[in-house]
Structures are given as C-alpha cells and as structure tokens.
C-alpha cells in the first residue's frame, strides 16, 4: 500500500524586500509618529486616513505604457464583469497621489484651503537593497487650495518643529529651499523654453551659443541630470550636461549635449549659493536675467525667506540653496529638503553625512488630472524610518524595550490572587503580566522575565501569602550587582525586598522611579 503524500509545508520567510518589526522598533516608531502628529495638529492640520489600495488610474504615476501596469507599484486586475474588464488596482506608492484623489472626490465637503496630514505604510515594487525595503512608512502634511507662498513657508517652519520634536537638535539639521521656477528661468536663458535667450550682462559673452531651442527630450535629460547632483557630484553632472560620461565599468551614458556656454549657465545656477540668503538671491537674479518665470521664482524665494525670518526661523535652520534639485522634474514651484548635518559611520566604517530625511514642495498640477482645473498644493513627506536610523546613529534612542513587571506563579491554585495583583498594577498605569507558562520550574519564570527585559518580578508563595507579604525583585539592580559587585556590596545593596501585600504597587512604582521608568 502506497504511503500517503505529505502535504508540503510553506516556508516561514518574509518576501524579498520586506521585513518584520518587533518590540522597541514598533514602539519607537509609534512614539515618533505621535510626536510629529502633535506638531501637525498644533499647526491646524487635520488627520486623513485613506485606503491603502487605489485604482491604477487614480495613482497615475510609475505606470508603463504596457498591458500590465505594474512597474513601480504592486498591481493586480480584478475579475471582469459581464460587460467590462476588471479594474486595475494597486497598493499606494506614496500618500500624495491618494490625497489628490480624495480632494477631487470630496472637494465640495472639504474646507478650502484643506490642510491634512497622513501617516502610514506605502509600497514600491522596486529592487530592494541595503536599508531599502518595498514597504516603508511615510508621514506627510499638505495644504491644498492655497496659492500663496505663505503656505510653503509654513510647511518649512513646521518641518523644523517636527525634527526638533523627535529629538534632532538645532544645529544638527538644515532645511534647504529652492524653486523650480528659477530652474525654468535658467532653462529659458539657455534656449530650452524660450525662442530667444535672455541673459544678464554677466552672461552676455556666452550669447552666441545660446540661441537654439532644445527639444523636450533634451530638457528631460537636463532635469534628470541635475537631479543626480548628490550622487555624481558637480563634475559628473557637467559631463552629463555635455556629450556624456563613462561610469566605473566603462559604460557610456549619453548626455544632453549642451554647449559649453549652456553648461556654464546651468552650473552657475547649481553653484549660486552665497554666504547669506541675500547673497544667494542676488546671484540667482543675475543668472535668470530678464526671464519672467525665473524672476518670479526668485521673488517667491525672497518672500519665503522674509516670512520665515518673521517667525524666527533664520538661516541657522533654513537656507536658500539652488543645489537642492531632487524632484525638480515633479514640483512646480518651491521645493525643500531637510538634511541632517552630523556625521555617522556607514556599514563599511566610512565617515559620511547622514543626509536627507524629508522633502517636499509645491505641486499645482496633481489635482488637475481629476478636475481639469489647476488646484494649488504644497506639502512635505518625512522619512520616519530614516529619522529613526539617524537617532540610533546619534545614540539618542534606547535600543532596548523595557518589558512588563512579571508576577510569578508559585501556586497554580492561587491564580486568582496573582491576577488580582496584576490588575492592581495595571490600574495604577504600570505595565504588568502574569506568567502563563508552565510554573513548575521557578528558574524558568525568572529566565522568562529576563528575556522580556522586565524591570521587576513579583513573588508570592504560600509562606508569603500567610504572612500577608510579597517579595519584589529588582531585576535591573540584580543584573548590575551580578556583573560587578563584591559579596560585601551585594549584602549592602539587596535587590529583593519583602513588603506588605498592600504596598505592592507603591514599592514597584518606587523601583521603577529609581531606574527612570516611572511615567
């Protein structure tokens, strides 16, 4: 007789590019989100929780022109109805695209301007790498329906407050601001957007090479090239603005093929940051010359700087920096990026700046996809996981998660008494649990408490019960004594105390307070 086939067991493993989070990681993220939400709420923003699933049509971004729209997103097609094919659905890849759909769908019921914040996981169907996962948290705040740059200034100020609220000290970060309109002015100057170059006197000597218009494809190459400034550096960008560059493997990446004069103008824009915001603005005005859109962008930066200064957000926290180019192909006006300025050791032991932890800007075209009308909007997205990594790197987060007080079980028949103890502790706001494993071996109960990183264990056997007392073991002090104390010190610093049963809560609270754990 043939043996029945065994049912194959599934592999217990996470999918590639995903990970699980435990204990302290979850608690620390929740606390950080709560602190950021507190700042958003203080600024008058309302919470929004939208669906994690959107139609592919509503998302609209990262989607290739192919039958299955799954590049960049996790997408699937619903079953077809009798009269039409099933809709394509996808997990959201950010929190901004859902906001555009929500505003377009509910705009008649929402205040104008609409100020909202949202927090939650997003999913990207991209190649994972070290520290780069396919699911991660975003924490956004946006104002929809306000065209004034006062909304952009407010977002920048709020971003500063958020960073300080989670433990990033002033001096350890800087919020850098640029404006897509200024870049448009630069492109206009070099013949990308206008029929004739409009140069300031400083650039008149370049005029003979600036007259021809560039194609839209070439403009796209220019935008993608300057977006790589952080990765390639100035010389790498200069090469890609010209004929191209070879990477370390020798492969050639074709460039925008600009003339030297055109490249010089673009590089002057990227290098226009002066010693003060005022100097930077002067440099930018000279570069954009008589370009209307360029001048408008510089004026907006100047106004933002004035508004921030009025609120005591000076250049020690927020600076105008034309080298902020990330996302300029997406945004339509001011852009901003929060960068941590302190140094850390990377995985290979090399010293480097931590880098960007938040970014945002003005995107006046996003809602237009749904309504056909331009709706001004501006906002910021904070990378919560990167912020947590930064605080870990600075040693400002305790990597251990303090466990609950453990009430041990010395007598199975008296479980009700132990439950009464733990109930009293919980009612006093103290995290506590009864040991629910096999109580036969008391040593295993203490090992369990150690595994849980418990600060205190409560012990009450038959003798203690008759006397009306409990034994309270300070596990933190006990561990310290076990590491270094002599016998005499151990006698002088006992880590276990006998107290009347009625004083259980008071004694536990006293021990927690001694270790800075009482809240």
Curated annotation (Swiss-Prot):
EC number from the UniProt entry: 6.1.1.21
Cell compartment(s), UniProt: Cytoplasm
Matching InterPro entries: aa-tRNA-synth_II, aa-tRNA-synth_II/BPL/LPL, Anticodon-bd, Anticodon-bd_dom_sf, His-tRNA-ligase, HisRS-like_core, HisRS/HisZ, HisRS_anticodon
Group of enzyme by EC: ligase
GO CC terms: cytoplasm
Family matches, as HAMAP family: His_tRNA_synth
Quaternary structure and partners: Homodimer.
Protein name per Swiss-Prot or TrEMBL: Histidine--tRNA ligase
Organism: Roseobacter denitrificans (strain ATCC 33942 / OCh 114)
Lineage of the species this protein comes from: Bacteria, Pseudomonadati, Pseudomonadota, Alphaproteobacteria, Rhodobacterales
GN (gene name): hisS
